[in-house]
Amino acid sequence: MTNTTTPTTIDNDFAPETHTVGNASAQSSVITTGSGLVRIAVTTHAHIKFGSNPTATEEDLLMPTDHVEVFRFKSGDKIAFIGHGAGSGEINISAID
């Protein structure tokens, strides 16, 4: 089987951030990305929302436990996140080239 995955290059304009995900919405810092792409990895069920001053709720996009995803993203925005239910864990956010 051949691996056709393209390697991910971290965008030097934004230092990757790791945050604790809990039962209250929290935000990343402002994310600068030249490619318009961000990579998000979570260790717990987490809901996420993008925007200039977002607040995440349990109605927003759900990322399941131990999931990694790449999203199109508007440079200059932030990512809000909140845990799903009583669990807690971490979210890692990286801008990619």
Predicted regions and their residues:
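Viral virion structural and adsorption modules
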Residues: 1-4, 96-97
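Surface-exposed ligand/attachment interfaces on beta-rich extracellular proteins
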Residues: 3-6, 10-34
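Short, solvent-exposed S/T- and G/P-enriched segments that are highly enriched in secreted/extracellular
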Residues: 21-28, 58-72
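Noncatalytic modules at the cell exterior or secretory-pathway interfaces
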Residues: 35-38, 72-88
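General beta-strand recognition
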Residues: 39, 47-49, 80, 92
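Short, surface-exposed beta-strand/strand-loop-strand elements in extracellular ectodomains
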Residues: 41-59
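Short beta-strand-to-coil "C-cap" segments at the C-terminal boundary of structured domains/repeats
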Residues: 51-52, 94-97
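Edge beta-strands of jelly-roll/beta-sandwich modules across compartments, strongly enriched
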Residues: 87-95
